[in-house]
């Protein structure tokens, strides 16, 4: 059965998944962390302050479990299609007939727009750091950041994996410094008042978005050559590290800032309670978080373009990054606006991903990664989680 499935998956391609380079477990894990960690993690404390602290813990546990299932299903979908990206998976599993190509390019357009909005938000946010540090015009900060961050992806997946690895280590160190400063200062009581169910829904949505690294899963599958154990380990560890960072940042902010938490972000609130030096450390964390997300998203988009067009990787890199810079320079919306729009699109595409996964699972007649946890009841749970996250992203917070 396994031999027959491999023949279907790798028809005329051979059994080995093709990739520009191989990733170590740490590098693959860091790509998952890098894609997930970002602006969302800094928004969680505000929403957590609007609910009892124990609600935050069970919401995080549910969001982590559903996201882990989703990521493993995506990994299996990609593995069943020889390490393909989302668009090619959709083309293989969902679309048939004369409208197949049209439907494929529509999906490509939606995913490209999602990445475009995401990366534009990273450029906008990072430029704000350069503007604050060096008093530069915003557009100059954007150009500087684009050149520095973009070159990492230009040199390929292996360099991205290495940079992600050391950036994740640096982020953990920065969070550790802030945590020690928080627990050695005057601490506030944790929130214990229930306000509204809508707040819990909004909190779930933000936590789910902060844990999401779905677009980077195919890179992991390709980077570890389809090794089942390495795929599962990298995804579980990557989402686990993101969950750990969310817990530390959230409780650190709740203890340090108390009920004075605002929508400005966790590090802004901490700087008010702990002192201005937190702003400097916070800027470093923000740059690292935004850069890891920039690398993961643009690497993914580069590969999607290359997969669909068969063009040179360097040209695909330019097509994946330059429009994001142009959109950021145009200033069509704010940093939060970019991220929110991209989040809604990304969550909605999750439903299509699960349908494609279900069809690929039936086609190959086996489940190398998810096993019984990939069966229909669990697929429905993941779809329900995606719907909840979508509703929570637009619901009013009280």
Give the predicted meaning of each segment.
Residues 1-46, 51, 68-72, 226, ...:
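Membrane-interface "cap" regions at the ends of multi-pass membrane proteins
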Residues 15-27, 52-60, 73-118, 131-138, ...:
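Transmembrane-helix boundary/entry motifs in multi-pass membrane transporters
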Residues 20, 139-144, 237-245, 250-264, ...:
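Loop-to-transmembrane helix boundary motifs in multi-pass membrane proteins
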Residues 29-35, 104-112, 131-156, 171-179, ...:
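Transmembrane alpha-helical segments of multi-pass small-molecule transport proteins
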Residues 45-52, 124-138, 158-167, 265-290, ...:
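Transmembrane helix-loop boundary segments of multi-pass membrane transporters
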Residues 88-98, 122-142, 222-227, 233-244, ...:
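Helix-loop-helix connectors at the membrane interface of multi-pass transporters/channels
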Residues 174-178, 288-297, 317-323, 342-367:
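Hydrophobic alpha-helical segments of multi-pass membrane transport proteins
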